[in-house]
Regions:
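The feature marks the mature, well-folded catalytic cores of soluble enzymes
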Residues: 1-219
Length: 219
């Protein structure tokens, strides 16, 4: 392809993107008292869509009605007690740590300095989502420290906590605002780990958690 042809193609792409951006900047009047997202969906519609998509791939979404940190902590503690998780590893994130305050100390695992062998003994991980993508039932989790990066993979169960305000319709709305000096990585989690062999036999948990629950806190 010649340089002139490549330049013409790039010019057409820029023109199309500019036109698309103008269309996106058209603001539709919002209904009074109803929280709406950029695509015009209410938060209730997005949470329902997210729950359906997550259920379709074997995960579970719990959308809390009661607002407040205490309600979230209570829901997380109830989940841990219900499934009798006894070695819970919590991401060193303020929101995740706050959600885990109701878990008895005897059930919590010390994460700092933990080896891979030690983390393999955890039966549940608790991590915080930066964004939830309703169209795919995916959670975007930002992890920084070495031990935190292992949490979405090693424990057989994973609980993801998020705020209803973190719900986005699609990836283009997700808050992926990485700074130049930002450390770590972002992990996209869509349901429990699913692996299929040549005979299409699906195995859960082979390369990640076999159980995934997303608890969405009310505003």
């Amino acid at each position: 392809m010649s340089i002139d042809a490549r330049a013409e193609i790039m010019a057409r792409i820029r023109a199309a993107l500019t036109s698309h951006e103008r269309d996106e900047h058209v603001v539709t009047p919002a209904m009074e008292g109803v929280s709406m997202t950029a695509d015009g969906a209410t938060t209730e519609e997005l949470s329902g869509r997210f729950a359906r998509e997550l259920a379709a791939v074997g995960g579970e979404a719990i959308v809390l009605v009661e607002a407040g940190d205490a309600a979230l902590a209570r829901s997380v503690a109830d989940r841990v007690a219900r499934f009798d998780y006894r070695a819970v590893a919590v991401q060193r994130d303020d929101f995740a740590l706050g959600a885990a305050v109701g878990i008895p100390a005897a059930r919590l695992m010390q994460l700092s300095g933990a080896s891979i062998y030690r983390l393999e003994q955890a039966d549940c991980a608790i991590v915080a989502a930066e964004s939830l993508i309703a169209n795919t039932g995916s959670a975007v989790v930002h992890v920084t420290a070495y031990e935190d990066r292992l949490l979405p993979y090693l424990p057989p169960a994973c609980i993801i906590v998020a705020c209803v305000s973190d719900l986005k319709a699609g990836l283009d709305e997700a808050a992926l605002r990485a700074g130049d000096d930002e450390r770590g990585e972002r992990v996209f989690i869509t349901g429990p780990s699913r692996t299929a062999d040549i005979e299409k036999t699906v195995v859960l948990g082979a390369h990640g958690p076999g159980s995934l629950t997303v608890i969405i806190a009310a505003s």
